[in-house]
């Protein structure tokens, strides 16, 4: 697990078609990046009475001057993270890992 995790909040979700969404999340103070750079989005997942952390890599679709971070998420059938990301609603919290 990354030591450089930051909680972010889902601002907006756009469903483009079944299995494809874009999400916009809060941009951490001072966060800089290059367009197309990969980061990891993670969730605390409840399973079998325990909470486990899982994350996957995603490419930033926003530009550095945007006040938010945007990602396109393709849902992987039976995946651990992408179906949960696609199901999130505005206001939900998730983790951003930036030390890739």
Predicted regions and their residues:
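Ferredoxin-reductase
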Residues: 2-92
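Low-complexity, rRNA-contacting terminal tracts
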Residues: 95
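A short, basic/flexible loop-to-alpha-helix module at the beginning of a structural domain
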Residues: 98-100
């Amino acid at each position: 697990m990354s030591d450089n995790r930051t909680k972010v909040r889902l601002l907006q979700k756009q469903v483009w078609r079944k299995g494809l969404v874009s999400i916009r999340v809060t941009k951490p103070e001072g966060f800089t990046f290059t367009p197309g750079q990969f980061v990891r989005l993670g969730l605390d997942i409840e399973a079998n009475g325990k909470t486990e952390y899982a994350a996957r890599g995603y490419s930033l679709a926003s530009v550095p001057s945007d006040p938010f971070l945007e990602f396109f998420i393709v849902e992987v059938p039976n995946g651990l993270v992408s179906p949960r990301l696609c199901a999130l609603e505005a206001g939900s919290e998730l983790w951003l890992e930036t030390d890739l």
